[in-house]
Regions:
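Small/polar beta-strand repeat architecture
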Residues: 90-224, 250-257, 263-266
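N-terminal beta-propeller domains
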Residues: 1-97, 186-214, 270-327
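Hydrophobic or amphipathic alpha-helical targeting/insertion segments
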Residues: 90, 232-246, 251-254
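A fold-level detector for beta-propeller and closely related beta-sheet-rich head/sensor domains
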Residues: 73-75, 215, 237-241, 260-263
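Short consensus segments that form the blades of beta-propeller domains
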Residues: 51, 71, 138-143, 225-226, ...
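Active-site-adjacent structural elements in enzyme catalytic domains
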Residues: 229-230, 239, 250-251, 263-287
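An acidic- and aromatic-residue-enriched active-site/binding cleft used to recognize and process polar
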Residues: 76-77, 85-86, 133, 154, ...
């Protein structure tokens, strides 16, 4: 009878070799950790919030205010949220507000509403909130119209479609009135893939020989966020887009705003990434527009090699002067 032998397994997962050559070791596992040389299952996950955030989340930042309130900044492919406790609050910045130019059109038997608003620049999946609209005459009431909608189809540069919660009838022949306010959030980004680029990009025969391919398609870039707290406030940026600022003192009912809209602001209008230097409190923008172009005049053209930073202790003062520390 063969004697029993105690098996001694080496801790850790090794996949640099085959499972055969990794004798006495572990080659494959899932949700396992090693403690004191022995394997054990990793504990489960607890649901952070029962509320749903729209889009694929790609950026999280946790910080506390001066009063001890804990916040989480969450950037997704469709929205930007501030999570207070366990409740996400939509603070997605606004890019355009129109007043008195939007109109609605309904078709009997359809829940699709056609919105005409000149030069709205919406992408498929963008979000717009209406107010001030009146009933179309039937079941498409003011209550139905005056809320947030996701764009379901873009007809052209002036017209797009949304889906109402009810089906229109023959009485819905109005246009919503002359006092409609349409508030457009910043354009969404992709959540999974990006378009191909490089050789062969674009349509066949476009442009002149050896000219650069134009692969900039609205909404066709992966939505990536960068964010950092400036004290108790939050600075955040869409890659290849504007820099935004959220003031914690105004609460989660207020949206983030373009940092260039703040008083006495000379910040970049476009950047690929932002962060705050923790020790000396400069806001730093990577891949932004330079302060001046080659002609010596102010420019808004992005340069991926340019790095700029605000004056110390200021998120808005970016102008290089002898009396500050911006650069």
């Amino acid at each position: 009878q063969m004697a029993l032998q105690k098996l001694q397994f080496k801790p850790g997962i090794v996949r640099d070799t085959t499972d055969y050559t990794n004798e006495g070791g572990w080659f494959d596992c899932d949700k396992v950790r090693f403690r004191m040389g022995l394997p054990e299952t990793i504990g489960g996950w607890a649901k952070f919030t029962n509320s749903t955030m729209l889009g694929t989340c790609r950026s999280l930042h946790v910080w506390s205010t001066l009063t001890g309130t804990n916040y989480v900044g969450a950037g997704t492919s469709k929205k930007f949220y501030i999570v207070d406790g366990s409740e996400p609050n939509d603070i997605t910045p606004i890019r355009l507000t129109t007043t008195g130019t939007a109109t609605f059109a309904a078709v009997d038997g359809s829940s699709t509403l056609t919105v005409t608003d000149p030069s709205n620049d919406v992408y498929l999946g963008d979000f717009v909130t209406f107010s001030g609209a009146v009933s179309l005459g039937g079941v498409i009431t003011a209550l139905v119209l005056n809320q947030e909608y996701e764009v379901t189809h873009v007809v052209d540069g002036n017209t797009y479609e949304i889906s109402a919660s009810v089906t229109a009838n023959a009485s819905d022949s109005g246009d919503g009135g002359a006092s409609i306010v349409a508030v457009y959030q910043i354009n969404i980004g992709l959540d999974t893939v990006v378009l191909g680029s490089g050789w062969g990009a674009g349509v066949w025969g476009r442009g002149t020989w050896s000219s650069a391919a134009d692969v900039t398609v609205p909404g066709a870039t992966l939505r990536l966020w960068s964010q950092d707290n400036f004290g108790e406030d939050l600075v955040f940026n869409v890659r290849g887009g504007a820099i935004y600022y959220w003031d914690a003192s105004v609460g989660t009912s207020s949206r983030g705003v373009n940092i260039t809209s703040l008083t006495n602001n000379s910040a970049p209008n476009i950047a690929n990434q932002v962060l705050v230097s923790e020790r000396d409190r400069h806001v730093i923008a990577f891949g932004c527009n330079p302060e001046f172009g080659s002609d010596g005049n102010p420019t808004t053209v992005q340069d991926p090699l340019v790095i700029r930073f605000s004056s110390q202790e200021s998120a808005t003062d970016w102008q290089t002067r002898p009396d500050n520390t911006a650069g």
